[in-house]
Amino acid sequence: MEKFCPTPLIKNNNDNFDLVENLNENDLLYSFGRLNVFHGQMGMFVRAMSYMLSHGADGLKQVSEDAVLNANYLRASLSSHLTPAFDGFCMHEILFSDDFLKDTGVETLDFAKAMIDEGYHPMTIYFPLVIHGALLVEPTETESKQSLDHFINTLCDLVERLKKDSDSFKAAPVFTPIRRLDETQAARKPVLRWKEEPLIAV
């Protein structure tokens, strides 16, 4: 895929390296030049192409079916503890509402933070916006039944714990180096570079 790489790129010319920017060079006939923001990242294209070529047509069909199967397995297994947003089968992701948290004092964010203490990165939360307190779970096609069952048991245990000790969810996560981050402030006032703190006069 080298001939399709966007510019600029670095070429090794024995003793030195050259920055290649000019599209008139023979080895850049297939390049479309600089990669603009909406085109994405070249590394992502390479990974996607590698994934597709390594699986082939039959393999892609199989992994797609596996992703849908895994999602529906989770949906069926979790529906007794969590509240599916819709009835019926789902595709590759399952959407839950926060109805199962009703009258517990725990919100979707608290539940997601508690998952961190259980060793799981939380699922997408509060999206889509049309579902109140949405939890969007997307199991990948590569998860084994054993790992799915472990995930199911963990979520069911968390829901059972809600009934006995909902206060612990407000403090979660407790096993991480940094506890609750203020995501809203981080999004509205991002710190994009490090500044050295002034020395304290003694």
Task: Locate predicted features.
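A generic, residue-level signal for flexible/boundary positions that often mark functional hotspots
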Residues: 3-4, 49, 78
